[in-house]
Amino acid sequence: SVADKAKAIEVIDQRKDEILNEAKDTDPNGKITVEETSFDGKVLTKGLSKRFIDCLFILPNGLVKRHEGETITSSNIGILEEDDNEIRLSCMVRSQFDSAKHSIADQVLKIVENYGGKAEIKSEYPGWQREDTPLIDLSNQVWKELHGDEMIVATTHGGLECGLLKGTLSNVEMISFGPEIHGAHSPAEKAHIKSVE
């Protein structure tokens, strides 16, 4: 139970506008409500709650490194699950460079272990850096013939098949291409239909 319910409600009321404002781009219809309910389940001890929140607070979450306006490395806290015996947290670490990805993953492992948790790497996919190769020039030439303008060459901060393929086909030139997408991985995600054709 909260020792001072009125104070807890006051603090939440003071912060909710600030929190909703921060989330307005991704959750424009967000709401925060507080109501008293009965609860007869288990709760974390005060000590465990503090350790867990402190651990969450210092885990790398979000942008880690940018270069020339492009995201190079990030780490995102994703799914949080709880049952009677444990709390499970999934983090996704991504980078164009495997060394940077491994460094951040090692940091996550060490932080969790320092707070008394257990951590493991369940899966990963390799990074991939765009290379300036004749294939890019050829692709641009074909694009120009088909569409009459220059192809946009850009880097994306997502998992691409090229990273997986490059591990097996290291001498093969490759590019990744796709449609024009806005608001990726958000409720407002949109794809420009003409760019899919």
Region annotations inferred by a language model:
Residues I12, K16-D27, P60, V108, ...:
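Structural signal for hydrophobic packing residues in well-ordered secondary-structure cores
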Residues S95-Q96, P126-R130, K190:
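Short, contiguous acidic/charged loop-to-helix segments that flank catalytic cores in large enzymes
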